[in-house]
Amino acid sequence: MKITVNTLHKLAEEGRKITMLTCYDASFASLLDEAGVEILLVGDSLGPVMQGVDSTLPVSEEDMLYHIRCVARGAKNALILGDMTFGAYQESPQQAFAHAARLLQAGAHMVKLEGGAYMAETTRFLVERGIPVCSHIGLTPQYVNMFGGYRVQGRGEDAQRILNDAKVLAEAGASLVLMECVPAPLAKEITETVKAPTIGIGAGADTSGQVLVLHDMLGVYPGKKAKFVKNFMEEAGSIQGAVQAYIKAVKDKTFPAEEHTY
């Protein structure tokens, strides 16, 4: 069954969890698609994961177009979500539309952009012109130099700001709201408040769905493992088994567990 925006909203309304994994090539796209992962995120995480750079900032539009095309060739049913790259959408809604249109022409079905309520005008501009949007709030990696590192967002008084971001962006027409590294109670409140389905990474188990970087889920990560990561390969013994275990754990609401949550 072809996954669409309507499919995602129906799953969320029925309380059935949505699964998302990053994907950068045709072979893994085919494997994840056949396993039943609903969303393949062609993320700018390809910078650190595939290119070996230390952040997502150097990733270019050309990089994204190449990897989206690769994934689109391998996926038959999954919805392909493409990241908008740093510097290619922040200047104006018009700049964002030109960038997003190229991502869709390459094979994406939806684009993801980072930022809070101030991105509402751009979100609305894209949606009104036929481009589905996933809003990325909380820890937004393209803002790493502003945050001074990769840190949990939304604690204390900052929680109200992130809740407002989610409300404003959903009202602007975002089809999905992705929350990264926010406290689980805040993510739960946002999920219960906004109409758009929510996807969490380091945001507790009460979101509409979950996402992990594929390589993290398979135990392929240099250095220290992030708190929200679980290595599904350890027990599964095969890539296909690990993917199936991830899907089952998300659907059964056993992942993320307490130890993966802020």
UniProtKB/Swiss-Prot annotation:
Keywords: Cytoplasm, Magnesium, Metal-binding, Pantothenate biosynthesis, Transferase. Its cofactor is Mg(2+). Homodecamer; pentamer of dimers. It is an enzyme of class 2 (transferase). Its EC number is 2.1.2.11. GO terms for biological process: pantothenate biosynthetic process. The active site is at residue 180. Binds 1 Mg(2+) ion per subunit. This is 3-methyl-2-oxobutanoate hydroxymethyltransferase. 3-methyl-2-oxobutanoate binds at residues 44-45, 83, 112. GO terms for molecular function: 3-methyl-2-oxobutanoate hydroxymethyltransferase activity; magnesium ion binding. It comes from Chromobacterium violaceum (strain ATCC 12472 / DSM 30191 / JCM 1249 / CCUG 213 / NBRC 12614 / NCIMB 9131 / NCTC 9757 / MK). Mg(2+) binds at residues 44, 83, 114. Pathway: Cofactor biosynthesis; (R)-pantothenate biosynthesis; (R)-pantoate from 3-methyl-2-oxobutanoate: step 1/2. The gene is panB. One of its GO terms (cellular component) is cytoplasm. Belongs to the PanB family. InterPro entries: Pantoate_hydroxy_MeTrfase, Pyrv/PenolPyrv_kinase-like_dom, Pyrv_kinase-like_dom_sf. It is found in: Cytoplasm. Catalyzes the reversible reaction in which hydroxymethyl group from 5,10-methylenetetrahydrofolate is transferred onto alpha-ketoisovalerate to form ketopantoate. NCBIfam families: panB, PRK00311.1. SUPFAM superfamilies: Phosphoenolpyruvate/pyruvate domain. It comes from the Bacteria. It catalyses: 3-methyl-2-oxobutanoate + (6R)-5,10-methylene-5,6,7,8-tetrahydrofolate + H2O = 2-dehydropantoate + (6S)-5,6,7,8-tetrahydrofolate.
